[in-house]
């Protein structure tokens, strides 16, 4: 089958070794594998001429997500499914669905400006972030009213999320099909560039991952977990993450994509 990866330009601008290895393995399975960055092309979307049987959405840009929506609308297969990616990328819909799935997650509010969240500080610190952000972009820890009144927020809706105290590290949970890994990384805006260290995945985390996989309809995804004194809290879900720090994830990623491509 023809499989095309919709990629993003990384920083630094070098291909992901994990994605490259997954592509190589898919080729050995008999697939014809290509990949390109949607922002580098002039893409007609009212009439599509597909060049692949399955598109793998690796990029999280708005352009790539919209193009995946156009592909989906024409009945062209996308992995992960477009609707699942759209739900995960929008923190409003993701948070609501996690509550429905009984996945522990912080209280969350949708706001139009930072100043609308002032009253929330009466009960403690909050996190402000874009409603469609990823990789920690635009995330702010707010502890005082002055931070909100002086904050220069990006255009568009924002999320105010109750701050969850933790050990100073995020637990990054990565999933490919039924396989679950966990990696601990320091919590800061550059954490996505670090590999972190692989750690044991306990049964509670496995159960959370299984609920998200089933409820969202995702096959390749990650979630950010804060290990709070009251138990784990999921603060974000991302489709097709980087899998940095996972022990040899490429074969499992390739096998998952192969299974989706073959419809099994």
What is each stretch, according to the model?
Residues 137-216:
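Phosphate-binding site of ATP-dependent enzymes
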Residues 189-234, 238, 246-264:
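A long amphipathic alpha-helix within ATP-dependent nucleotide-binding catalytic cores
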Residues 31, 35-36, 73-138:
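A conserved helix-loop-beta module that forms one wall/lid of the active-site cleft
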């Amino acid at each position: 089958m023809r499989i095309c990866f919709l990629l993003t330009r990384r920083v630094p601008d070098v291909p992901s070794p994990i994605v490259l290895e997954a592509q190589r393995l898919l080729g050995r399975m008999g697939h014809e594998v290509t990949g390109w960055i949607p922002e580098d092309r002039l893409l007609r979307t009212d009439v599509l001429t597909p060049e692949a049987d399955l598109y793998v959405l690796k990029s999280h840009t708005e352009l790539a997500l919209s193009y995946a929506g156009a592909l989906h609308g024409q009945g062209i297969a996308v992995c992960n499914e477009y609707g699942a990616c759209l739900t995960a990328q929008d923190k409003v819909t993701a948070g609501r669905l996690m509550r429905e799935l009984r996945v522990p997650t912080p209280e969350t509010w949708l706001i139009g400006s930072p100043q609308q969240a002032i009253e929330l500080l009466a009960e403690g610190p909050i996190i402000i972030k874009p409603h469609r952000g990823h990789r920690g972009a635009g995330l702010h820890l707010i502890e005082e009213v002055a931070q909100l009144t002086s904050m220069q927020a990006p255009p568009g809706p924002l999320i105010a999320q109750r701050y969850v105290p933790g050990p100073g590290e995020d637990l990054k949970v990565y999933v490919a099909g039924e396989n679950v890994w966990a990696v601990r990384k320091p919590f800061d805006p550059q954490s996505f560039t670090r590999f972190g260290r692989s750690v044991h995945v306990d049964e509670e985390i496995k159960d959370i991952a299984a609920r998200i996989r089933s409820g969202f309809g995702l096959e390749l995804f990650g979630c950010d977990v804060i290990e709070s004194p009251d138990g784990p809290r999921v603060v974000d879900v991302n489709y097709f993450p980087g899998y940095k720090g996972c022990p040899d994830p490429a074969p499992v990623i390739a096998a998952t994509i192969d299974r989706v491509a073959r419809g099994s």
